[in-house]
Amino acid sequence: MADAEKNAVAEKNNAVATKEVLAEAAAILEPVGLQEEAELPAKIMEEFMRNSRKKDKLLCSQLQVVNFLQTFLAQEDTEQSPDALASEDASRQKATETKEQWKDMKATYMDHVDVIKCALSEALPQVKEAHRKYTELQKAFEQLEAKKRVLEEKLQLAQKQWVLQQKRLQNLTKISAEVKRRRKRALEKLDGSHQELETLKQQAGQEQEKLQRNQSYLQLLCSLQNKLVISEGKAEDKDVKGRALTAKSKSP
């Protein structure tokens, strides 16, 4: 009865350990982040080796139990009195049952190992694919980082050019303001020159009118002077003729 309890406890421990292995394998096969994908193959192999060691220890302990039972049964057979030989069949039956239980436990263990191997064989391609995708994403990330650096350099260059353009614009604004100021002064001077020109034109017109009046006055004086000269010439001629006649009349 004690042996059956030991076998039941061993089988229960084996089932619990197998469930733990399956749970750990399922936890390992769950989706992980990008930073953990590269560690999945090593992690899975590590878990598999650790679980394999656990199963080996469990199998060793079970073999020790079986060895102990076989040794105990052999000692019991050798130490039995002739009166106890009647229960030999019952002991053999117990041993047979124990061996059958051991075979069942071993078969269950091997089934669980096969399940784990199958799960690992299915998970490894997924891990490789995840690792490949991680590598591609890493390359894409590096390319994006390179493009980001190029864009940042272009942005800095554009900012510098914008600052230079702003300075040039400020200089052009100052130059434009100076040109407008000078143009305004030139226009003011031009307006003053126009006004002076109009004044000079008016003065020239007035002077021309004075000159015309003076010319008319001079022409009038000249004509009057000519008339006086002619009149004086005629008078002198008359005087000369009169004197000549007087002289003739006085001569004998």
UniProtKB/Swiss-Prot annotation:
Q: What Gene3D superfamilies is this protein classified in?
A: 1.20.5.4090
Top-level taxon of origin: Eukaryota
Q: Where in the cell is it found?
A: Nucleus; Chromosome, Centromere, Kinetochore
Keyword flag Transcription regulation:
no
Q: Which InterPro entries match?
A: Zwint-1
What Pfam families does the annotation carry? Zwint (PF15556)
Biased composition, class Basic and acidic residues, residue ranges: 89-99
Which regions form coiled coils?
Answer: 120-221
An annotated GO cellular component of this protein is: kinetochore
Q: Where are the annotated segments for Disordered?
A: 80-99
Q: Phosphoserine is carried by which residues? A: S216, S249
Q: Which UniProt keywords apply?
A: Cell cycle, Cell division, Centromere, Chromosome, Coiled coil, Kinetochore, Mitosis, Nucleus, Phosphoprotein
Whether Cell cycle counts among this entry's keywords is: yes
Give the GO biological process terms.
cell division; homologous chromosome orientation in meiotic metaphase I; regulation of meiosis I spindle assembly checkpoint
The subunit field of the Swiss-Prot or TrEMBL record says: Component of the KNL1 complex composed of KNL1 and ZWINT. Part of the ten-subunit outer kinetochore KMN network that includes the KNL1, MIS12 and NDC80 complexes; a bioriented kinetochore contains approximately 150 copies of the network. Interacts with the MIS12 complex subunits MIS12 DSN1, and PMF1. Interacts with the NDC80 complex subunit NDC80 during mitosis. Interacts with ZW10. Interacts with CETN3.
The entry's function note states: Acts as a component of the outer kinetochore KNL1 complex that serves as a docking point for spindle assembly checkpoint components and mediates microtubule-kinetochore interactions. Kinetochores, consisting of a centromere-associated inner segment and a microtubule-contacting outer segment, play a crucial role in chromosome segregation by mediating the physical connection between centromeric DNA and spindle microtubules.
The protein's name is Outer kinetochore KNL1 complex subunit ZWINT
Native species of this protein? Answer: Mus musculus
Coding gene? Zwint
